[in-house]
């Protein structure tokens, strides 16, 4: 299955983080509310389906969080200290 423009449900079901693309979450449907230890993104079901939505949970949209991860290594500058370097595999279809 090719990645979709605004998220890849198949990749998320395998445990890949929708923000950074690393295999850090449990195998589940999008919206498990788990926090990725690599980028500190909370897996929010609304933001997974609407990447421009800014929630009270993550305080940035999924699209902005992906851009932030590429520049600062975290979903937002406010959570950089809560992240770590990845040692998990990354989704080969990354970026979404």
What is each of the regions a protein language model found here?
Residues 35, 46-48:
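Compact nucleic-acid interaction/catalytic patches
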Residues 14, 33:
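Residues immediately within or flanking Cys/His clusters that coordinate Zn2+
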Residues 26-27, 44-46:
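Short, non-ligating residues that shape and space the ligands of small metal-coordination modules
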Residues 17-20, 36-39:
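Short cysteine-rich clusters marking metal-coordination/redox-active sites
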Residues 1-9, 51-96:
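Short, intrinsically disordered terminal segments enriched in charged and Pro/Gly residues
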Residues 2-8, 19-27:
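Short, intrinsically disordered, charge-biased short linear motifs at domain edges
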